[in-house]
Amino acid sequence: QYVSLPVYGAELALSGEKLVRSLTALTDDDISIRQLFRAPQGFSARFNAQARSYRYRICAGSARPVLGWDHVWWYNGHLDAELMDKAAQALVGEHDFKSFCKAISAEGKPTHRFVERLTVEEIEEAGEKFIAVDITGNAFLHNMVRTIVGTLVEIGRGHRPVEWIDEVLAAQNRIAAGSCAPAQ
């Protein structure tokens, strides 16, 4: 995660190491400052980003996740990650993602986005197995990533065929897609 913040006056003269220590002292324990980059005045990590990447984790199975319980969606059932990944490939490229965003947020706004990469794979972290949905794109609409995940879960659980993703994309209507995955 990258953030940008303005630095003024005497702070500009501080070394990067000193600034990192100062910021670390001011932040909560669950935030870790790892690196500092000096950027031109007016730079915004949000608006000047060329790409954004997200990882959404799902714990599929009857056992709740132990370590990831507060940042993983526990889905009590089986999911076919290979089918989910196959369907996900239809979303790579430039498309109108209106079906995958909160309907009210799409009114009168452009909904075309470019997804550079979208993969679904089984992973293991700290001894627990998860399904990771990794997506990289130029920008995302409101709830777009979570709605993509919810739609892929419908396919992974066998309730919809892989080809359904094409219908959802073509519909350009939020009602056509699966439910929005929970915030994690």
Functional labels for PLM-detected ranges:
Residues Q1-Q184:
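Structured-RNA-binding interfaces characteristic of tRNA pseudouridine synthases
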